[in-house]
Amino acid sequence: MNESVTIRGKDRYKSGVMEYKKMGYWEPDYEPKDTDIIALFRVTPQDGVDPTEASAAVAGESSTATWTVVWTDRLTAAEKYRAKCYRVDPVPNSPGQFFAYIAYDLDLFENGSIANLSASIIGNVFGFKPLKALRLEDMRLPVAYVKTFQGPATGIVVERERMDKFGRPLLGATVKPKLGLSGRNYGRVVYEALKGGLDFTKDDENINSQPFMHWRERFLYCMEAVNKAQAASGEIKGTYLNVTAGTMEEMYERAEFAKQLGSVIIMIDLVIGYTAIQSMAKWARRNDMILHLHRAGHSTYTRQRNHGVSFRVIAKWMRLAGVDHIHAGTVVGKLEGDPATTKGYYDICREDYNPMQLEHGIFFEQNWASLNKLMPVASGGIHAGQMHQLLDHLGEDVVLQFGGGTIGHPMGIQAGATANRVALEAMIMARNEGRDYLHEGEEILAKAALTCTPLKAALETWKNVTFNYESTDMPDYAPTPSVSM
């Protein structure tokens, strides 16, 4: 269907039920304004449901519509405030699924509020019965809207200056086991990992304040470890102190204590919610603190290809919200992440401007105006033997976190950290010399291991470890002469 079927005049407001596409939510001739927010949905209608009607219903139910005509529409600027589905395309190689492009007037949204944005776009429509499934694939956020957010509190450039580390990825490790250690033993892990050559250590998502280790005890032992490691190495170090708690008051208390102890970074979990994330980001900016976000819980709605919210959308929202770090995938690790899709996530985090790149799952141009860049974090099943692949796939503006790949080292935690640092330095040197480090990677690592026993042990221990599973979320990209130009 390529033409509008909107009913105009007094018939539009007659009491009763009317198809969404006839109420003005399907406007194929509409030209989106520069100030419109545009959402791309993957729509899977129920059998027998017209895909155009299903897409118009998504537009309606995510903006001004309800299930029946209401005369109070006439008390508003209804033509302006209705979301408008202006394009519906079949999804390549996915029968029964359709891409619906929907434009929203900027006045529908509160400035600087992810909670309000998400309440409109995904708040109600995902349970709509005429749909088998619905996924929010991407969004275009106009500069006028982007500028109402503070963006990352610190940003990549200032973080590097604060840490005094340039020209290479930063190295980190999540303390393992994530639960059960006493504060003293937890601090010992932090000290050995940092002294061995890592830049950061990290709490995991579910370490908060439990009977085996109170949060205050953990903070004290961790910062003692950081200070000792800094004194021993002469380098600036940090540990992500997870301030996630049951209330905002408790989170602020923990963040303030971390600041008093001299920490350069705190951590929160995605599950605390968008308003709490923005509140902590504002606190971090006021207090010159780097803010790390663990994407805990995201796969419950980002992983399935036909229903939920794409992680590229979450990455955009979190850059607006103001976090400095976000876990964004590894490509080669144990967690979900198609190479092309992951590249798109990293571009969203790190670029000032994103062109449309369908092969990376990016459907719209995105101008980030003056917002700081967001540092992506790679963690989950990575080890020193993959260093050449990680550098090639992810670049240098990234935190590489080797949890098991540090703490599981056969010679101990400090040796594991040293192995990762030596592997990284060897690869950076090869890159700076102009070598083809991706294809020569194994040779480069083997040569470095001749003078580094910890690296030799790491390469031997994990030489056969790979996670070669097919990704469940890949770009829906079918090259054509027009698309591939």
Swiss-Prot record:
RuBisCO catalyzes two reactions: the carboxylation of D-ribulose 1,5-bisphosphate, the primary event in carbon dioxide fixation, as well as the oxidative fragmentation of the pentose substrate in the photorespiration process. Both reactions occur simultaneously and in competition at the same active site. Substrate binds at residues 124, 174, 178, 295, 327, 379. The keyword Magnesium applies. Mg(2+) binds at residues 202, 204-205. Binds 1 Mg(2+) ion per subunit. The lineage of its organism: Bacteria, Pseudomonadati, Pseudomonadota, Alphaproteobacteria, Hyphomicrobiales. Its EC number is 4.1.1.39. Its cofactor is Mg(2+). HAMAP family: RuBisCO_L_type1. The active site is at residues 176, 294. This is Ribulose bisphosphate carboxylase large chain. It catalyses: 2 (2R)-3-phosphoglycerate + 2 H(+) = D-ribulose 1,5-bisphosphate + CO2 + H2O; D-ribulose 1,5-bisphosphate + O2 = 2-phosphoglycolate + (2R)-3-phosphoglycerate + 2 H(+). Belongs to the RuBisCO large chain family. Type I subfamily. GO terms for biological process: reductive pentose-phosphate cycle. The record marks 334 as: Transition state stabilizer. Gene3D superfamilies: Ribulose bisphosphate carboxylase, large subunit, C-terminal domain, RuBisCO large subunit, N-terminal domain. Heterohexadecamer of 8 large chains and 8 small chains. The modification N6-carboxylysine is found at residue 202. It comes from the Bacteria. Keywords: Calvin cycle, Carbon dioxide fixation, Lyase, Magnesium, Metal-binding, Monooxygenase, Oxidoreductase, Photosynthesis. The basic functional RuBisCO is composed of a large chain homodimer in a 'head-to-tail' conformation. In form I RuBisCO this homodimer is arranged in a barrel-like tetramer with the small subunits forming a tetrameric 'cap' on each end of the 'barrel'. InterPro entries: RuBisCO, RuBisCo_large_chain_AS, RuBisCO_lsu_C, RuBisCO_lsu_C_sf, RuBisCO_lsu_fd_N, RuBisCO_lsu_N_sf, RuBisCO_lsuI.
